[in-house]
Amino acid sequence: MDESYTQRFGGIGRLYGAAALPRLQAAHVAIVGVGGVGSWIVEALVRSGIGELTLIDMDDVCITNTNRQLPALAHTIGVSKVDVLAARVAEINPACRVNRIVEFLTESNVDRLLAPNFDFVVDAVDRTSIKALIIAKCHSRGLPVITSGSAGGRRDPTAIRIADLGHAGADPLLRSTRQCLRRDYNFAKSEQGRPVTMDIPCVFSTEKPVFPWADGSCSLEPESGAETGLRLDCAAGFGAATFVTGTFGFVLAAEVVRRLAAVE
């Protein structure tokens, strides 16, 4: 390690032990989805001394991202999120290597995009089929992976938890992901209604989501006749706040750093 690295990240060494710094500097982490949750993961990982990041996302910054996403600034509207974050990483730690992949991960490119021997893969996308695809591919290759539940509609950052995917409760996004993994990828099913450990860590909220209503009000109950499968998107769907999406990202990053720092 050079002097600039130890100056920047000596505080991390005093938190996890000096022996952890070379491991963090040598680590390569992929973040799939760098929006409301993923952008904060990138921020936390580069500030924790991770030496190489692969950022995977095809979205551009939109003005409606302002309430929840790190790259959303007045001068970045319309710019690739991956490019904005890569530039930010370079300002934080110029020695951090960043691989920019301006693509959405799909069935047709998953083998190529997840081909490197990543030390960790972080799933921060909000489509069930793609979450299951990422998890299944990493599981089959022996790549450590962690996945995020839904941050949309939540107000309370203190309700965020980390657990095994098989024990993640009623989070609808993770519940659908579990079902997809069991149906399409032969993951173990629950036994007599009891959760089965899946060896996949996940971050989720125990808070009930707040639903937006057409009249501008919000409720813990979905509006009659309205779409129930709301997503966190730019113009409609669940609302979101940075203090929740950021906390999701930081909890995910904390678990990645904890595991990487402990690996001999």
Regions found by a protein language model. Give the residues of each.
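Aromatic pocket-lining residues of Rossmann-like dinucleotide-binding sites
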Residues: 45
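N-terminal charged helix/coil linker that caps or initiates catalytic domains
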Residues: 1-30
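Conserved N-terminal Rossmann-fold NAD(P)-binding element of oxidoreductases
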Residues: 31-33, 56
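A structured beta-alpha segment of the ubiquitous adenosine-cofactor-binding alpha/beta core
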Residues: 78, 82-119, 125-128
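Hydrophobic/small residue at the entry helix of a nucleotide-binding pocket
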Residues: 37
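Glycine-rich phosphate-binding loop and adjoining beta1-alpha1-beta2 segment
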Residues: 50-93
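Glycine-rich phosphate/adenylate-binding loop
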Residues: 2-3, 116-120, 125-133, 140, ...
